[in-house]
Amino acid sequence: MALTFELDPAFDRSVRDGVVALWTDVSNAGGAVGFVPPVTADDIRPELVKHLVAIAEGRTRLLVGYNEDGAVAATAFLALNSHRLMTHWLWLYTVMVHPRHQGRGYGRDLMAAAADAARGIDGIEAVRLTCRGGTGADRFYAACGYKEVGRVPDAIRVAEGDDRDDIIMLLPLG
């Protein structure tokens, strides 16, 4: 069964708790979404608050994918650029599909929904994201149409002696 996507959902308790639970589960499954396992919901909440502040200020939009039970199963944050010379593209952050839903094509569905959401924002011509090297995420994003446009070697320190490249990818929307 396919996910149902909603851009800018009402951020009630169920969405908040669903996003925190999703982020915690993805992180603990090894997902490269800003943390290294193990993490708890208490570790995640301050990062979510940062996104919520940006949403309240109109700088970020939240895309949520709901499963057939109406639970949060996927998310992505679309962050607008404030620099006057870069307002024609946006950032895609914290792209997540719950581990129990992986392998069903939901990641591609999420990426397509994010691209559609970006196309619906006036003046947006491209989507940019970064991903952690060594995870295979760059191959996934390439399969979704993104092109690698840059790489910063050893920019992400996962652990002492385990530095990963920060891979910059771009999806032109034209």
Regions found by a protein language model. Give the residues of each.
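Helix-turn-helix
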Residues: 137
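Active-site acidic-Proline motif in GNAT/NAT acetyltransferases
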Residues: 98-100, 104, 133
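Residues forming the Rossmann-fold NAD(P)(H) cofactor-binding site
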Residues: 108
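Conserved catalytic-core motifs of GNAT/GCN5-like acyltransferases
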Residues: 128-131, 142, 147-165
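Conserved GNAT acetyl-CoA-binding A-motif
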Residues: 111, 118-131
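Short hydrophobic/aromatic beta-strand or adjacent loop that forms the aromatic wall/cage
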Residues: 60, 164-168
